[in-house]
Amino acid sequence: MKRKFVGAAIGGALAVAGAPVALSAVGFTGAGIAAGSIAAKMMSAAAIANGGGIAAGGLVATLQSVGVLGLSTITNIILVAVGTATGARAEGSMGASREQESGPQDPPQELQEPQEPPSCKKQDLNLGKFVGAAIGGALAVAGAPIALSAVGFTGAGIAAGSIAAKMMSAAAIANGGGIAAGGLVATLQSVGILGLSTSTNIILGAVGAATGATAAGAMGACREQEPGLQDLQQEPKEPQEPQELQKQQEPQEPQELQKQQETQETQETQELQKTQEPPSYEK
């Protein structure tokens, strides 16, 4: 449960902070559309399709306005809701524990076969980023109605006893019994019933794609193989017999020194034999 709260907080923060990052990455910056960027190509294609102009309220105009002026408070609230739901779900699935089986347990880690180190190829990391971007974008767009429905803004209206009902009650008390048009509760209620607009879905998809690609890149970072693992992967050497080990440990004398010792021993033997011979008595 604690991990879900942490994941929800991180997801909400990344959703709000990731929107300007994602828009700036494709070229919708605070100073305008960056030359040679994806945004510039989108603007060129939209101008050709509209006979030389950019349609007001269209995709390019909306993203350009968001890049220059930033997101509205309502859009940020929706992003927080989507990021919170997505982060909590991701953290809950990653932190789910496996129940311990009642049968025989697995052997210790030292006795298991050493696994190959993770692949550090650049192609694998790029593929992981593309997959993470696709999953993040899909989750962001699909998670908006789920997040709104979870707090009580459903397609049939505000659910009784939900967080949305408490928000509506507080707003009604603050406004003297009515709900202000264009306010937070009215906007979320409208989104819950009618759904998000195309431009908002595009922004959500961009934020989710940027967040998913960043997460996939961080999770796919390779760790270098530790030097001790190579020693563990080598086959153990057979123990040597004591006699062979003793032979290896005995120092071998040089051949010249051995010849000198043999010559010296021969001379000493000859001198000893001469001294031991009995004297001869000749007549």
Swiss-Prot record:
Pfam families linked: Ifi-6-16 (PF06140)
Induction entry: Up-regulated by type-I interferon. Up-regulated by poly(I:C).
Location(s), subcellular: Mitochondrion inner membrane
GO CC term, one of those recorded: mitochondrial inner membrane
Chain intervals with Low complexity compositional bias: 242-283
Principal location listed in the UniProt entry: mitochondrion
Transit peptide: 1-90
GO molecular function: identical protein binding
InterPro entries: IFI6/IFI27-like, IFI6/IFI27-like_sf
Similarity comment: family membership: Belongs to the IFI6/IFI27 family.
Identification of the protein by name: Interferon alpha-inducible protein 27-like protein 2B
Gene that specifies this protein: Ifi27l2b
